[in-house]
Amino acid sequence: LFAALFASAYTDRSFSALVRVTVDGDAHVIEKTVFYLDSEGEMRAFDYLLSQGESALGDWQKFSGNVRYHFLGPLSNLNIIAAREYSVGSSAASISLEYDAQGFFSARQMGVRTTRYELDASRLNLAPGKTGEFSLGNSMTIDMIFPEDAVNVEVRPEPGVQKTSYNGLSWSGPISGKWEVSFEREQPLSQEVTEFFSQLYLDATNSYALFLVLLFLVVVAFKLVKLRE
């Protein structure tokens, strides 16, 4: 019965993705697709899955082509949130995917204290056949937020991208193209000093331990010589 109901039509209303970049260059992604259920059968099918509490991603994908991973992996910690959107319309509904994407940005050491992060465009899967591109249709947006200590945030080319007040970038459709995105993080001088003295202490401790071992061997050798005499 429900297999037949799933075959009914839907109308996409909007798609949004929030990408929070971590200090490791990974990303925590929240995608939300809002759509209209265009028939009574589809509304019953959606409400049925909603009442089950937990359903597989494949079950929800039948309601909209936008319900899929728009960023490639390795991916982990998937959480699916489905809801009716009565504030939008009586037949509106939404499905959100929340997950972690590893290696979203590649990290490269630029100096003693500076690390540069560059977007790995191969992780983008926003439109079929356009891997590596920011390809967004009408009513589609992507917000990318960088770590609080990110500096020198750069995007090339700049046209088509809005810099936000919360240390991030925003793309709004319709738009299609390739952008290079990068930022830097600087290790605080205090942390560098702390790590220096910690390493110095560790080296000194290791040297002292080696000294004790050598001293022990010398004492043992001395006693063996005495015994032979």
Can you describe what each PLM-predicted range is?
Residues T194-L214:
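Juxtamembrane/start-of-transmembrane alpha-helix segments at the extracytoplasmic/lumenal side
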Residues S172-Q199:
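Juxtamembrane amphipathic/hinge helix adjacent to a transmembrane helix
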Residues Y10-L49:
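Early extracytoplasmic/domain-onset interaction patches
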Residues L1-T11:
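Hydrophobic secretory-pathway targeting helix
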Residues V21-G25, T33-S39, Y99-F105, A121-R123, ...:
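Beta-strand elements of well-folded, non-transmembrane domains
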Residues G25, V34, Y48-Y69:
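Non-catalytic, solvent-exposed interaction/assembly segments
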Residues H70-T164:
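Surface-exposed, acidic/Ser/Thr-rich flexible loop segments
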Residues L214-E229:
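C-terminal membrane-anchoring or membrane-association module
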